[in-house]
Amino acid sequence: MGLTYQLIPVLVCLLVCTSHLVHGHKCDITLAEIIKTLNILTTRKNSCMELPVADVFAAPKNTTEKETFCRVGIELRRIYRSHTCLNKFLGGLDRNLNSLVSKTCSVNEAKTGTSTLKDLLERLKTIMKEKYSKC
């Protein structure tokens, strides 16, 4: 028994609509998890929060959001691989950022100033909250 010609468009519509809902929901979950982790990190009183990092948000104006998130990931990896503090949170944050960007993250290193880890995380939290409100 074959599908009727009237049923095929309905099934295609259901497939498209449900896949859109699933992908949108993943965006919400990932962003919420990133924001939760950033809230935990930024309220901690830890000497690692004063570590110097590259000011990745001082990149040129034509830098895309993905490139910025890649730069943040690079800085997070540099911190949690060379210091033993906050590894669990910084590693999880790095993984979640990578899931928003892509598997390959090739970014040209730009000459930037320095900032602290706390400042980087605070600015990232602001960006993620804005992104979450639009998701």
From Swiss-Prot:
The gene is IL4. This is Interleukin-4. Belongs to the IL-4/IL-13 family. Disulfide bonds join C27-C135, C48-C85, C70-C105. Glycans are attached at N62. GO terms for cellular component: extracellular space. The keyword Glycoprotein applies. SUPFAM superfamilies: 4-helical cytokines. InterPro entries: 4_helix_cytokine-like_core, IL-4, IL-4/IL-13, IL-4/IL-13_CS. The lineage of its organism: Eukaryota, Metazoa, Chordata, Craniata, Vertebrata. It comes from Bubalus bubalis (Domestic water buffalo).
